[in-house]
Amino acid sequence: MMAMNAKQPFGMHPVLQEPKFSSLHSGSEAMRRVCLPAPQLQGNIFGSFDESLLARAEALAAVDIVSHGKNHPFKPDATYHTMSSVPCTSTSPTVPISHPAALTSHPHHAVHQGLEGDLLEHISPTLSVSGLGAPEHSVMPAQIHPHHLGAMGHLHQAMGMSHPHAVAPHSAMPACLSDVESDPRELEAFAERFKQRRIKLGVTQADVGAALANLKIPGVGSLSQSTICRFESLTLSHNNMIALKPVLQAWLEEAEAAYREKNSKPELFNGSERKRKRTSIAAPEKRSLEAYFAIQPRPSSEKIAAIAEKLDLKKNVVRVWFCNQRQKQKRMKYSAVH
């Protein structure tokens, strides 16, 4: 019987070494080592009997915990087993153990363990971006308290909120530009400036309206003369003034560029300018030319140049006038004969 009692605890231990009650077995083993010395060292003949009593007490306690765990899913011993399984050596120096409750059985640790895993998936990229380093996943749940996770959650939220402020100045720039363009005083100043430049270029309002179609602006065709007139007189609606301003500004820039190019190369435009523009001679210069024509109807080229210089006229203008005057005299003589 002594041999049977001595073998009985060893028959019970494989059942108690299941992963579900490994923490209870380790706790009872620690209690046995502290409270009871080894039977072979004590030399007690009832050592094996004490071992069997302790084994039966462990089995009853295990059954009680299993029945209690069905009603209450929270297991402090399982939590303690999870916490005690973490090695004491620091494997991640970047995250120090600052909370003492992280190494003990915290009452709410097992409840929030799944939540911590989800939060760490979102926080770990933030830590790597901010330069804190990403620790190992097996050590993080045991070393970070839920309160620490809340603080890092606020840090992640603050980092996420920092991006709109960085973009805010860029998004505010178009609003400032639109305010400047929609200012009535700016529109009035541009309308007056446009009118003065148009007159200086020698272009009519109708020419401006017809030339807008040549700009190839999407949605913009030729406009009537009355529309350009109403823009210069500020009688259009405010929205139409705002919409028409960039179109007229584009035309004005192109017209001034063409005008500057024509002035820089006048020899390319003399022929077309002579056909398009008609010269008018004032009355005093006309009387002087008639006096020269009465003296010499066919002056030489040198005489024409001298007359043009004296009257402050172009040589070509004086030459054409003498030619036209001779044709006029021929018509008068022909009509008088017939």
Curated annotation (Swiss-Prot):
SUPFAM superfamilies referenced in this protein's UniProt entry, alphabetically: Homeodomain-like, lambda repressor-like DNA-binding domains
Subcellular location: Nucleus; Cytoplasm
Consequences of knocking out this gene: Mutants are deaf and show deficits in balance and coordination that become severe at about P14 and exhibit hyperactivity by 5-6 weeks.
UniProt-listed SMART domains: HOX (SM00389), POU (SM00352)
Motif (POU-IV box): 56-65
GO CC annotations, alphabetized: cytoplasm; nucleoplasm; nucleus; transcription regulator complex
Annotated Pfam families: Homeodomain, Pou
Protein name: POU domain, class 4, transcription factor 3
